[in-house]
Amino acid sequence: MSGNSTQSEMMDRLAEAAWNELATTSPRHIHIDDVAAAAEIPAAAARAVSGSITALILHQLAMLDRQAVLESLADIEDAGDVSIREKIVEALMHRFEVYAPHKAQIIQLDAAARRDPALGLRLLDSLGQAMRMMLRMVGDDVAGLAGEARVRGVALVAMQVARVWKTDDSADLSTTLKEIDARLTRAEEWGRTLRVLRDPHSDAAMHDTSSEGDADGGDAG
């Protein structure tokens, strides 16, 4: 096994161990030595590889987000010809399904982020990266300022829906799905910042630059 592979495997194990502790412990009370012991990795090596507990948490979030996107891609490809909006609904919904077993960790992170603005910014950046990856998966190149606005707009939708998801006890997360649809509809009504939600089969183009699009442009955030 190469050095890079060993480091990657160690990081995965440490991230999983930290994530498990996060279910019942605030991030600021998680100690790297305890995480290392749970992952069966020497403490010195754990400190060298991980850097910080926050880095381990972000690593685990990234792995879950990649899992959600890849699984959504497979589902979307099996579904055949569907609109970009439907793809986004499917991808957002599946992301909440992937995170469903980890609600305790998300609640801990939300509480910690309110106390620690630096952590909050790191988590916002992580969410932005996840939404950027998701939009690229559904066919948006997220290029330029308009693309970044769409990323932020969908990230805002995800944050708003998460408030409902955290208390959604339905087996199929039907309440969450309704909230996704409602929030996306509202975002569309706000303007063309989320032009990626427009179906290219029923509109001129996903990145329409017509005068109508310019006139309707707004801030989804």
Regions found by a protein language model. Give the residues of each.
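Helix-turn-helix
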Residues: S2, R13, E21-H59, M63
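Hydrophobic alpha-helical connector segments
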Residues: H59, L73-Q108, D125
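An extended, acidic
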Residues: F96-Y99, A104-R122, M131, V154, ...
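Amphipathic alpha-helical packing segments from all-alpha helical-bundle domains
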Residues: P117-D140, E148-M159, K178
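Inter-helical turn/loop segments and adjacent helix faces that build the functional surface
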Residues: D140-L145, V164-S174
